[in-house]
């Protein structure tokens, strides 16, 4: 088991436990990092920001912030069908995709032909459970190129509104 009590955490590596992992702090930033355990709990006194990282638990995954949970192109998941995933914020849950562009990439059809092109793609914000998924916000749940999926029951609830949008080209 791992129990981390931090002020502000910026994780860009891997924090992995065979059993339970708990991270509690003022602000939690998971930037392209991995936080993973059998039971994974991430709690922030202000914000949790998961930017293209992964927060994963097998049996249970809980991500809670007193202000906002912001998932930008990242994955928050629970991987056992008997388990539960909870993402909750007293203010907003924001689950957005991140657009990126790869330009001047060489594409070769054969030895005599080739061209260069620009590819624009989106890493979706993913909140995914094999078991039950619960996403709740005191104010708003907002998703742009974000998904919430569940192998069983999914609940998305907000004190004010739930908005879902596709990612646009601009």
Regions found by a protein language model. Give the residues of each.
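Binding/recognition "hotspot" determinant
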Residues: 1-170
